[in-house]
């Protein structure tokens, strides 16, 4: 079954040994419009590029040194902005509270003003309960598709039967 887009109801150190050069995955996305067909690195790259389109400065982290962070971004808006840590999960199944707890701990450890957890699937009620009243945004598959569409990227999420 294919998810539909759902409209959501949300000084940066650019020299860091965790950062890697990233490619522009968006130019190749037309060839593989199903996000579930991207490998994990391509998906993380897509998320980094998306947040750049949203208006953030963003850097992809090295897998071996990410400390639970896939993208470190900076939101330049006065008062509302700051350092943002982003975790990308290309999942078929429900993302539970443990992933949100991990992101929150990483966010505090990194001194970030916000954490964003992005998934191709959806979150369980316990994940939303934990994130409530915290500077954490949970972006599910429908909201991700909506955000991509808002920035001119037509994509879809179709879960293959054998994917976990």
Please report, for each region that a protein language model flagged, where it lies by residue.
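Mixed-charge (Asp/Glu-Lys/Arg
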Residues: 1-164
